[in-house]
Amino acid sequence: MRMLLGSFAVYAAAALCEIGGCYAWWCWRRAGAGAWVLLPGMASLALFGWLLTLVDSDTAGRTFAAYGGIYIVGAIVWLRLVEGRPVTLRDAAGVAICLAGAAIILSAGRGAER
């Protein structure tokens, strides 16, 4: 259980870094922000990549797949808290489906190649 909570914390931090880094590019390209926002954005994306290497997993692909569910939750939370947009029923249903998939992948654990 402790390892699962640790992985969740790393995934949540990685999601914040990835979403924040991508949002910097979005702000520069689509919202008219100055190019200076790209510097913290790139640093955030580099930190995102490093964080995923901290997850206790035998395979990168399984790590990235499980992370995807957490990323989607983070993106919807970002939508609400940062962009101020409402979360729709379809958003919530999509999150639930993705979390179920991530839970299945995470429950396999290490060495679950069968």
Curated annotation (Swiss-Prot):
The lineage of its organism: Bacteria, Pseudomonadati, Pseudomonadota, Alphaproteobacteria, Acetobacterales. GO terms for cellular component: plasma membrane. Its main location: membrane. HAMAP family: UPF0060. Pfam families: UPF0060. This is UPF0060 membrane protein GDI3492/Gdia_2889. It is found in: Cell inner membrane. Disulfide bonds: none annotated. Keywords: Cell inner membrane, Cell membrane, Membrane, Transmembrane, Transmembrane helix.
